[in-house]
Amino acid sequence: MSIRTEKVASLLQQELGAILEKELPRSSALSTVVDVKVTADLGIARIYVSVIGTEEQRTAIMAWLHDETKYLRKLLSAKIRHHFRRIPEIEFFEDRIYERASRIEQLLREVRKAPEQHD
């Protein structure tokens, strides 16, 4: 990734995080913009969102993001239009890295306990 695309990705992550904090429907689930990948031509931004909550909450939030993509892009445009001639199209993807990390930690704890049980 070039320095330009990294800067764009960082700005998009920051601004979208702020937008989602205000715009996401209130629920007990925690949502975070984890990463943003921007194509070399700056035409598409892939937004990776982590949702910590029940499966139902994750599904609902991801569905809302997909349904409201145009609206969210419009809000983003209003915030960053002075930085760009053209605002990238945005695509949302769910990132379950925290869920996977939690599962790995759980497995490691079980492995550490296993030798103690055999003594």
UniProtKB/Swiss-Prot annotation:
Quaternary context: Monomer. Binds 30S ribosomal subunits, but not 50S ribosomal subunits or 70S ribosomes.
Pfam family of the protein (one): RBFA
Keyword Ribosomal protein recorded: no
Protein name in the entry: Ribosome-binding factor A
Sample GO molecular function, one term: ribosomal small subunit binding
Functional summary from the UniProt entry: One of several proteins that assist in the late maturation steps of the functional core of the 30S ribosomal subunit. Associates with free 30S ribosomal subunits (but not with 30S subunits that are part of 70S ribosomes or polysomes). Required for efficient processing of 16S rRNA. May interact with the 5'-terminal helix region of 16S rRNA.
InterPro entries: KH_dom-like_a/b (IPR015946), RbfA (IPR000238), RbfA_dom_sf (IPR023799)
Organism from which the protein derives: Chlorobium limicola (strain DSM 245 / NBRC 103803 / 6330)
Cellular localization per UniProt: Cytoplasm
GO cellular component: cytosol
Xref: Gene3D superfamilies: 3.30.300.20
Family to which this protein belongs: Belongs to the RbfA family.
Keyword line: Cytoplasm, Ribosome biogenesis
Superkingdom assignment: Bacteria
Gene name tied to this protein: rbfA
A Gene Ontology biological process term: maturation of SSU-rRNA
Location, primary (coarse class): cytoplasm
Keyword Oxidoreductase listed: no
